[in-house]
Amino acid sequence: MSASPLLGMSRREFLTKLTGAGAAAFLMDWAAPVIEKAYGAGPCPGHLTDIEHIVLLMQENRSFDHYFGTLSSTNGFNAASPAFQQMGWNPMTQALDPAGVTIPFRLDTTRGPFLDGECVNDPEHQWVGMHLAWNGGANDNWLPAQATTRAGPYVPLTMGYYTRQDIPIHYLLADTFTICDGYHCSLLTGTLPNRLYWLSANIDPAGTDGGPQLVEPGFLPLQQFSWRIMPENLEDAGVSWKVYQNKGLGRFINTPISNNGLVQAFRQAADPRSNLARYGIAPTYPGDFAADVRANRLPKVSWLVPNILQSEHPALPVALGAVSMVTALRILLSNPAVWEKTALIVSYDENGGFFDHVTPPTAPPGTPGEFVTVPNIDAVPGSGGIRGPLGLGFRVPCIVISPYSRGPLMVSDTFDHTSQLKLIRARFGVPVPNMTAWRDGVVGDMTSAFNFATPPNSTRPNLSHPLLGALPKLPQCIPNVVLGTTDGALPSIPYRVPYPQVMPTQETTPVRGTPSGLCS
């Protein structure tokens, strides 16, 4: 059976093509009910096909509880969970203590230089550390896991969290659109492996195509990998795409500040004349992204990679992360014709070693594609002899920003980075062949994050630009920025755990609704 000519076409596109063919008015009247039925119009004012652009923005190193544990209506600090009491640090003595108990504590951003929770450093968050924290699913070993690589005063930082007062723009975005409280990073490890999953749903656990990539290297590899990536699937399907990335600071430390981004790590992008290089390496952010939005040439799928200062990687100010999100949103809002048919998904690559009380779903031993299967596991950098499971990893923040996801809304379905690829599959019919059968059955496709049963609201959200408020915070973070991006290799300024301890609670308002998802 041949594919329907309606497949992948919005109602607007169909009508344009029909009128462009010179169809008479009576034909339009006759065809309208058929067209509406084809799109399942019924009582639904919106449909997945109305979203013509999917824009993916990924930030750095924050867990859900760390950012949104106090947010109303979500699976946060009000949950009944023994995981909130982690053993290994004594807040009264401010010392390592196997019998000591630490609960989540606020990282207060109002205390000024050298005391400021804005500038805390990176907890341990690589493959070994996150598997130790997960502890076979017990989720009870966060502090001892930190103590394997961090000196005493830095161990309890894993339990720190922020409130609305500390990250007001993040909370405002969560109130204005759909927050996902069941969104996980893909892997129990750090940045590069999770970003590879975001781009390709793979880290090559069998070691046949340049992997396995289990940890974050000091430098982004050049043309190391050769497995198929999602842009190639889009290319073959004729679906337009680009990776827009900031070009500043060169190939140094973390993926967000690589001058050529993730695609350059693949051998098939080595030819600068190839479409992988033209669309996956050359486009700049925010310059080319803004130009394409203005000119109505935004591709169907876009990946955004801002500069390091706006990535929210500890010890950079969390306030600068708001600059990144608002900048992307403002660019989209600058062209209402683009904004009204766009979904911007803001997620975080990994939890950054910050605590989350929800134990992630993980694959049973032996699940194909979900464990490292190279013969010599000890030869894999950073493996610590651990074969898996690969994931899911711990929860991270995710906000779905679109006229079709105006909030306050919350969805609790289980998602991970491959869910973004599944959304692309659902909307444009492009396969995700790297995804394992187990993962495909566990995580959703994010269509449930949209409220298609309600008319879209494309009015401009009331968001002031946070740049002026964020810039003064940067100088007070400089000591920890310099020392804290070295994965604990140099001593930085610790944050003292408050004592006595008080378990945090969640806000009571706003009450969040549940989006309709697809409807008919």
UniProtKB/Swiss-Prot annotation:
Keyword Kinase attributed? no
InterPro entries with a match to the protein in the record: Alkaline_phosphatase_core_sf, Phosphoesterase, TAT_signal
Pfam families per record: Phosphoesterase
Q: Lineage of the source organism?
A: Bacteria, Bacillati, Actinomycetota, Actinomycetes, Mycobacteriales
Give the protein's biological function.
Involved in virulence. Induces cytotoxic effects on mouse macrophage cell lines, via direct or indirect enzymatic hydrolysis of cell membrane phospholipids. Hydrolyzes phosphatidylcholine and sphingomyelin. Does not have hemolytic activity.
Temperature notes for this entry: Optimum temperature is 37 degrees Celsius.
Could you tell me the Gene Ontology terms of the biological process aspect for this record?
A: symbiont-mediated disruption of host cellular anatomical structure
Q: Which reaction does it catalyse?
A: a 1,2-diacyl-sn-glycero-3-phosphocholine + H2O = phosphocholine + a 1,2-diacyl-sn-glycerol + H(+); a sphingomyelin + H2O = phosphocholine + an N-acylsphing-4-enine + H(+); 1,2-dihexadecanoyl-sn-glycero-3-phosphocholine + H2O = 1,2-dihexadecanoyl-sn-glycerol + phosphocholine + H(+)
Q: What name does this protein carry?
A: Phospholipase C A
User: Which GO terms fall under molecular function for this chain's record?
Assistant: phosphatidylcholine phospholipase C activity; phospholipase C activity; sphingomyelin phosphodiesterase activity
Q: Give the EC number.
A: 3.1.4.3
Induction or repression = Constitutively expressed. Expression is induced in vitro in the presence of phosphatidylcholine. Also induced upon infection of THP-1 macrophages.
- Which residues, if any, are the signal sequence? 1-38
Kindly provide the PTM information from the record.
Answer: Predicted to be exported by the Tat system. The position of the signal peptide cleavage has not been experimentally proven.
Instruction: Supply the PROSITE patterns for this chain.
Output: TAT (PS51318)
Localization (cell) = Secreted, Cell wall
User: Keywords on this record?
Assistant: Cell wall, Hydrolase, Secreted, Signal, Virulence
Q: Which GO terms describe its cellular component?
A: extracellular region
Q: Which gene encodes it?
A: plcA
Further comment? Polymorphism was discovered in the phospholipase plcA/B/C region. Some strains seem to lack both plcA and plcB genes, while others lack only plcB.
Relay the pH-dependence remark from the record. Answer: Optimum pH is 7.5.
Q: Which organism is it from?
A: Mycobacterium tuberculosis (strain ATCC 25618 / H37Rv)
The similarity comment for this entry is: Belongs to the bacterial phospholipase C family.
Q: Please indicate if the UniProt record lists Transit peptide as a keyword.
A: no
